[in-house]
Amino acid sequence: MVFASGVLYHMEEPIRLLKLISKVSDKIFIWTHYYDKGIISNRVELRHKFDPVSSFQYDGISYDYATQSYKDALAWEGFCGGPKPISIWLTRDSIIKALRQLGFADIQFNFEHLNHPNGPAFAICAKK
């Protein structure tokens, strides 16, 4: 089992990470933030960090995402999340689509937190 808590939303290539995980395990736990335009656009403290929703292709499949910028957080002495200035936040549906495409048929959700201070988040347990 791969345990990826607080990792996916810091990636520049989140689908690639999920694909790599799918090659080494048939079970995965993920806790992650995801992009939801309706929620984030109504949060003044968050919306300035995100570009508009866009799409990209990975292995011929389209996924929706928003680029998130760490902005001033990169200057913090503590951990801000990643060494790069940006990360890719997939939409909730794109995360689920990617897991299904990678063969994870049994997907369970929990700990949905729409009002998390850093943006909407949820946990997933998935197995092939």
Predicted regions span which residues?
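S-adenosyl-L-methionine-dependent methyltransferase catalytic module, highlighting the catalytic core
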Residues: A4, E12-C125
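Conserved SAM-binding site of S-adenosyl-L-methionine-dependent methyltransferases, i.e.
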Residues: L8
